[in-house]
Each structure stands twice: as structure tokens, then as C-alpha cells.
């Protein structure tokens, strides 16, 4: 059964995730404790052997091997390999979940398209939705061990009511070397076409909509089957597994406490006459390697996460509840196309019939939310310039072929030492203000403000020419 803790993390609070660490079902402790105990036992055996059973010469050789293993373990890019692999597995896991076929859309279309309150109409609707559920049961039998244990043979499928004996005989008479989960979908299409000929489906548009929804449903069944068929390449899984196991095999030897290497002590101060040098100091003798055990817990746990969700249709604690999905889909779909068909509550005026702005009430616990202003956009409270000239509308002239003028920034020009824009700026490139004469002060770059005198003179000439053109009828 899927482990759900959504309610426990509904609010961010102190120690919110810490409370989840005490759970056992679906936890990393349940997945990893055997490997963790094995790693600790092997580490203890090697430590006891080094401390009690080896001679001084053998200890020296062992220390050399341990230092070599410790250096070699750091050469394995474990975080890089595991990160990519777990990301791939998690994306695949979620895609498999979204590929589980649900009949909700299809049952609504059946209820709206297949008409008739008599026994024939009821039979058509129930049979169509039963065929859809049968297709999902057949494909889930092929990919989920839980469903296969529930329906080990086709006789169990018949006894569960998803298929009749005649349908089973017809199904088994079809000879094919491939999985036949698609057969109920073909029965569905043939029965829908017959309902159209009989007038139960009133037009071709409704039939087309019904078949489109069926194809979406069948596509999910097919995708689920192909996810089970095409796995993540085995070589990738092998590389990741070998990398993790190799890292901790080297760590078993390399992380052991050994005597410090000669000359490894830090440089000491000058000794006084008669003072003996201090012995070489190494790492403290940790009988329990806490950091190594934590590293094993993180990396091996990371690999266990991928191992659990790489196939979510098994029987682990966090695998998909396929049997409950089958029960839910059958019950809901039959209810919608049979008992709920044309079974409507009376249409009545709603509570806010005469109100222009309906406002549902709040409880005391949520009343403060009603005082918050509604979100109108990130730029709603942006302060605009008080200068009215900045809000004047102008028309661009894309046919001019000349570059648009740059805005004059006197303050920036003082700091950067830049002059006025290029003399190639023409007043004809500026659009006219809609409904008003062109204000020359918007385009004039005066020489006394730090601009180019030659550019200012040219702008004055073009301003005069444009003014003459505006006066002509």
C-alpha cells in the first residue's frame, strides 16, 4: 500500500520533516538495514584482524594497502553517476504513473453519446465501459505482480465479472503470438459502430468523439505495456551498481584506522636542548567510523531509492496500488453510465441569482484571507514617471531605413564622457504625436547640454523643414 504523508507536511513548521524519520513502513531503514549491518560487520572483522591478529610487519603492509584504497575510492565519481541515474529513474517512475489508464473521460463521453433508457441502451453503455475496464485489467496483469496474483488465469477474470464465458471463448480463439490486451478495444469500436447504425449514437460527431477518447485510453494501455517491455539499459544499471559496490569495497579497507605514516606529522617548532620530539600524530582512533557509516547510508540509500521505484508495479510498500485502482475504476465507471444516466437533480436558481458580485462566506479560521487584496499582476503597483511627456504616444516609421534615435542622458554623459547621439539621426524617423503637432523639444539635442554642435545644427534644419511641410495643405 502506498505510504502517504501529505497531511503531515501540509504546513512548514519546526521539525516538520523530522517526524517522518521515525516511520518504519516505506522507510529507507527498512530497505537498507541488511546491507548496513553487513557493511558494519565486515568493517569490524577487518578492524579486529588489523588490531589483534597481524604482526608489526603485516600491519605496515596493510597500512600501505589501506592508504592506497582510500586514495582510489575518491577517484570514483559516485555522486555524478548516481545523480544522473536516480533522476532518470524518477522521471520514468512518474511517467509510468501518468500512463495508468483511467476511464473517467471515456465514461463521461459514453454517458453523453450512447442514448436509451431501455434495456438495450443500458446494455450498450455498460458493455462499452466494461470492455474498457477489461483492457486495463489485461494490461495490468501483464505488468503488475499484484494484479497477476489476483487474476492468475482468464477464469479468474471471468469470475470477477470483467468478461463473460462467450467473450472468453472468443478471446482465446484469436490466435496471436503477442499480448492481446487490445482485443477489448476492438470489440468496443465494433459495438460503438453498431450503436451508431441502430441510432443509439445520434450523429457521426458523437461517434468520432467516443472513438477519440477510446484511442487515448488504448494509448495509455499501450504505453504502460511498453514501459514494462523496454527497461532502462542494463549496462547503465550495472555501471551504477558496480560503482557503488566498488566504492564501499575500497572504503572497507581504506577507511580503517592504521598507524600514521612516518613523516606525516606537522612541522614542529625548534626543540630546546634536552627536549624530545613529540610522536607523530594521526587521526583519532575511531572504533566506530561514523562518517564512513553515514556515507554508506547516503550513497547506498540513494541506490536503494532507484531500486525500489524502477518498477513501481511490484509489491513494495511504495508501489502503485493497482488492485485498488481496478476496483475504483469499475465501480465509478459503471455508476456513471448506468445509475447516473439521465438521473439529474432539478435545475434551480443558485444562491447568488440576484447578486452581481457573489461572495461565499468564510469561517472564523479563514476570515483573515478575505482581507487580503486580490492579485492583479506584478506591474500593478509600479510607479510611473510624473513627467507627462513620457506618456505621449508616438508613431514609429519602419519604412525610413534609418536607426531609431538614442535617448539623451545628460547625467550619464557627465560620468561616462559620452556625447550626443550620431548626426545621422533624422527628425523624419520620429513619428508624429497622435492628434498634436510634433514637439521639437523632444527631439532637440542642445550643444550646451553636452551634445555635438554639428548634430544640433542638423536637427534644427530638419525641424524647420518638417514644420514647413506641416503647414502645407
UniProtKB/Swiss-Prot annotation:
A Pfam family of the record is Bestrophin
Q: Which reaction does it catalyse?
A: chloride(in) = chloride(out); hydrogencarbonate(in) = hydrogencarbonate(out)
Q: Does the keyword Chloroplast apply?
A: no
**Does the keyword field hold Transmembrane?**
yes
The biased composition feature labelled Basic and acidic residues covers 445-461
Q: Which residues lie on this side of the membrane: Extracellular?
A: 52-60, 256-289
Give the Cytoplasmic compartment stretches of this protein. 1-31, 83-237, 304-473
Membrane-spanning parts = 32-51, 61-82, 238-255, 290-303
Cellular localization per UniProt: Cell membrane
Region Disordered, residue ranges: 379-408, 428-473
Q: Which portions of the chain have biased composition (kind: Low complexity)?
A: 396-407
What's this chain's function?
A: Ligand-gated anion channel that allows the movement of anions across cell membranes when activated by Calcium (Ca2+). Mediates the movement of hydrogencarbonate and chloride.
> Its family?
Belongs to the anion channel-forming bestrophin (TC 1.A.46) family. Calcium-sensitive chloride channel subfamily.
- The protein here is known as Bestrophin-4
What is the organism field in this record? Homo sapiens
The gene from which this protein is expressed is BEST4
